[in-house]
Amino acid sequence: MTPANAPAPSPATPSATPYGTLPPAATPSARKPLSLPRLREMHAQGEKITMLTAYDATFAAVADAAGVECILVGDSLGMVCQGLTSTVGVTLETMRHHTECVANGLRRSHATAWLIGDLPFGTYHESKEQALRNAVALMQAGAHMVKLEGGGWTADTVRFLVERGIPVCAHLGLTPQTVHALGGYRVQGKTEEAAATLKREAHELQDAGAAMLVLEMVPAALSAALTQALTHCPTIGIGAGNGTAGQVLVLHDMLGMNLGKMPKFVRNFMDGAPSVRGAMEAYVRAVKDGSFPVNATHAW
């Protein structure tokens, strides 16, 4: 028996949860949660926006802790997680599942990152109503914004979603879902005609209400010009030079987990980094200070 005058036992010291999972009572971040007004403010002030892909709770929480502002649950998971040869086979249910995983991780770690979910191939092509149903599914899974690929033909869909309260990130240049139609993973907008088309489509998407625009494998000079011209739609580049409003990389690429030939626009941030979080922090610093990407090395 415990003596009546015995001191009360000390509260148990919280211990790490098993299997590397996130503690449900993590210390809230001092940073304010990201929002569309804040992202527009960063763009207006010339502060670079950082984005990485993530597909599960732990990597998403680590990315947020490293200072990454936007997390993209990309359909690239089809290639880096599922082993597919393109993103075409990724389903809405797969995207919904991974979006929910990432959202859970961000919530449990009191994260501040802005979460974007990719609408996969075939989920917004049939009609605006189809796009709405599927965008709602990703928003209900925890996304703050949905992303869809395509040029001017998507403008009406973008407007339809925005009018119904769903923020949209558009995607021009190399659009991996249409890689077969494009003839492979090729730089887009190299000719005068192609550049003019990209400019027109970018303005159409901004006018439709797109709040962000990914530019993939677009010549650096063209990307910089588009960024200057789009006054209220920040551009996020991947293989598009350092003149965009922000940068995004696929998580596995920037951690050097690519067993094949590394894309030209990628830097392995694990080189010299003490940890995955350290690599992500190095990425954030490099984007913020303009040392990544380097046009002569990582762009066209």
Curated annotation (Swiss-Prot):
Any one Pfam family match given in the protein's UniProt record, by short name: Pantoate_transf
Involved pathway(s): Cofactor biosynthesis; (R)-pantothenate biosynthesis; (R)-pantoate from 3-methyl-2-oxobutanoate: step 1/2
Designated name of the protein: 3-methyl-2-oxobutanoate hydroxymethyltransferase
Start and end residues of each stretch annotated as Disordered: 1-34
Subcellular location: Cytoplasm
Cofactor binding notes: Binds 1 Mg(2+) ion per subunit.
Organism for this UniProt entry: Polaromonas sp. (strain JS666 / ATCC BAA-500)
Cofactor(s), by name: Mg(2+)
An annotated GO cellular component: cytoplasm
Family according to the record: Belongs to the PanB family.
Binding residues annotated for 3-methyl-2-oxobutanoate, in chain numbering: 75-76, 118, 147
Gene Ontology molecular functions: 3-methyl-2-oxobutanoate hydroxymethyltransferase activity; magnesium ion binding
